[in-house]
């Protein structure tokens, strides 16, 4: 299953911005896989924080092969020590076990998240240990398929904006200008800015000075073009 969008969203974005229009036409349709199961999506995102996509897939595969079904009951039965043995940090294992306990006890209802507004869902998800605002936003996009997710905390989106619009820096004011321009289809704009940041338009370079903070360097190394900032780690 892929993130659902069509000509309506693309036509809207083309009409709003010439540079994004050119990027859309040159890159073509982008297919990004989604996971419609919120429970597994939360677990998958906790596993994937600050590691490569390949490492994330390896840990997830080990978990599935060992536990069979990945659900609250099997995760609680496994416990943090066994979860850690699949290749994640003990802290992540604790976060996952705690999340499973909340779901099993009814303290957290995954189905209720789907009925919430974006702001409500982000607040509820980021209240979980191990889930910050950026991760919550990615869950809304790649699980719930919310149409207007455009994350200021996503370093690759900021990089894509710098490259496409030749900014040396994207501050909050710049970002909000683009967020308003692309709304209500910020999620589709995000897909194309991630592609730009990943080198889909090879002639575009990042005009930002090369020096990075230590935090940004760790994020970039771990997540490639899909990196973000999450303070709730």
Give each language-model segment a name.
Residues 19-23, 51-52, 56-129, 181-183:
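Alpha-helical ds-nucleic-acid-binding substructure associated with the helix-hairpin-helix region
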Residues 8, 14-68:
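A positional/architectural concept
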Residues 31, 55, 75, 110-113, ...:
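Short, surface-exposed helix-loop/turn micro-motifs enriched in polar/charged residues
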Residues 1-3, 36-39, 73-75, 114-117, ...:
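Short acidic alpha-helix initiation/capping motifs at coil-to-helix transition points
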Residues 1-30, 94, 133-233:
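C-terminal accessory module of base-excision DNA glycosylases/AP lyases that mediates lesion recognition
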Residues 46, 79, 83, 107, ...:
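Short amphipathic alpha-helical interaction patches enriched in hydrophobic/aromatic residues
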Residues 41-46, 78-82, 120-124, 138, ...:
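A general alpha-helix detector
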């Amino acid at each position: 299953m892929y993130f659902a969008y069509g000509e309506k969203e693309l036509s809207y974005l083309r009409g709003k911005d010439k540079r994004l229009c050119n990027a859309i036409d040159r890159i073509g349709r982008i297919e990004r896989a989604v996971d419609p199961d919120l429970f597994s999506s939360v677990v998958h995102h906790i596993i994937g924080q600050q590691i490569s996509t390949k490492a994330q897939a390896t840990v997830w595969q080990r978990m599935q092969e060992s536990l069979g079904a990945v659900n609250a009951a099997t995760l609680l039965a496994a416990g943090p020590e066994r979860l850690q043995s699949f290749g994640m940090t003990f802290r992540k294992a604790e976060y996952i076990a705690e999340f499973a306990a909340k779901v099993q006890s009814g303290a957290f209802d995954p189905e209720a998240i789907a009925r919430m507004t974006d702001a409500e869902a982000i607040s509820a998800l980021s209240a979980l240990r191990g889930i910050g605002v950026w991760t919550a936003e990615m869950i809304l996009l790649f699980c719930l398929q919310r149409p207007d997710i455009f994350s200021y905390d996503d370093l690759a989106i900021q990089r894509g904006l710098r490259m496409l619009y030749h900014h040396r820096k994207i501050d909050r004011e710049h970002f909000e200008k683009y967020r308003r321009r692309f709304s209500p289809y910020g999620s589709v704009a995000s897909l194309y800015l991630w592609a730009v940041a990943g080198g889909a338009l090879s002639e575009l370079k990042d005009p930002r000075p090369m020096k990075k903070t230590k935090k940004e360097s760790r994020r970039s190394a771990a997540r490639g073009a899909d990196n973000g900032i999450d303070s709730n780690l």
